[in-house]
Amino acid sequence: MASVIEKGLASICCVTTSSKPWAEGEADGDVKYEDLRGPGGRNTSGSVSDKRICVPQKIDPKTFFANERTFLKWMSISVMIGMMSLTLLNFGDTSSNASELAGLVLLPVSILFMIHSLFVFKDRANKIYMREPMRYDDTKGPTILVLVLGVSLGIAAIFSVQKQYYRTASSSFNDGPRFS
């Protein structure tokens, strides 16, 4: 019954459960297990037997909170980009399609930001829970997402300028010469 509850809580917390709650490693010669013998093989603890003690690794809660805080920051950025795209779609200039096009370009970018932040959050939470050594900074993800956002904003700006220029150029040429 307890294992079912632990698995349920672990699935809610976005991590997988481990059958070993203690520090995992080899039984012999692992630094995660403390040996009671002192230098020269003497027993320094005063106990009768030379037993090994399995010491659990402590996980600092600040690590989990920092991971969650990073996830929430990325989600807030993606929600702001999504709101900008929806604003452009709903309240943009109706005479040209440039605002609609800019909104349609930014909407997938915001969804991409959300998906990326969710996968990074789950991966980090799982690695933290499993006590795997890892780098906590993401070197490739933000760079790729910023490049995608920059390209999409550039495309939206180019199409907006092109539509505006095409509209003013075509209206001035279609009116014909004006002689007053």
Curated annotation (Swiss-Prot):
Q: Which residues lie on this side of the membrane: Vacuolar?
A: 92-100, 162-180
TM ranges = 71-91, 101-121, 141-161
Membrane topology category: Multi-pass membrane protein
Any one GO biological process = post-transcriptional regulation of gene expression
List locations, semicolon-separated.
Answer: Acidocalcisome membrane
This entry carries the following GO cellular component terms, namely:
acidocalcisome; acidocalcisome membrane
Sequence ranges on the Cytoplasmic membrane side: 1-70, 122-140
- Note the SS bond partners: none
* Chief localization: membrane
Protein keywords: Membrane, Transmembrane, Transmembrane helix
InterPro entries listed in its UniProt record: DUF202, VTC_Complex_Subunit
The phenotype of cells or organisms lacking this gene is: Causes an abnormal morphology of acidocalcisomes, a significant decrease in the amount of polyP and a deficient response to hyposmotic stress.
Family the UniProt entry places it in: Belongs to the VTC1 family.
Q: What does this protein do?
A: Accessory subunit of the vacuolar transporter chaperone (VTC) complex. The VTC complex acts as a vacuolar polyphosphate polymerase that catalyzes the synthesis of inorganic polyphosphate (polyP) via transfer of phosphate from ATP to a growing polyP chain, releasing ADP. VTC exposes its catalytic domain vtc4 to the cytosol, where the growing polyP chain winds through a tunnel-shaped pocket, integrating cytoplasmic polymer synthesis with polyP membrane translocation.
Quote the subunit structure annotation: The VTC core complex is an integral membrane heterooligomer composed of at least the catalytic subunit vtc4 and the accessory subunits vtc1 and vtc2. vtc1 is a small membrane protein without hydrophilic domain. Vtc2 and vtc4 are related and have 2 hydrophilic domains that face the cytosol, an N-terminal SPX domain and the central core domain. The central core in vtc4 is the catalytic domain.
State the protein's name: Vacuolar transporter chaperone complex subunit 1
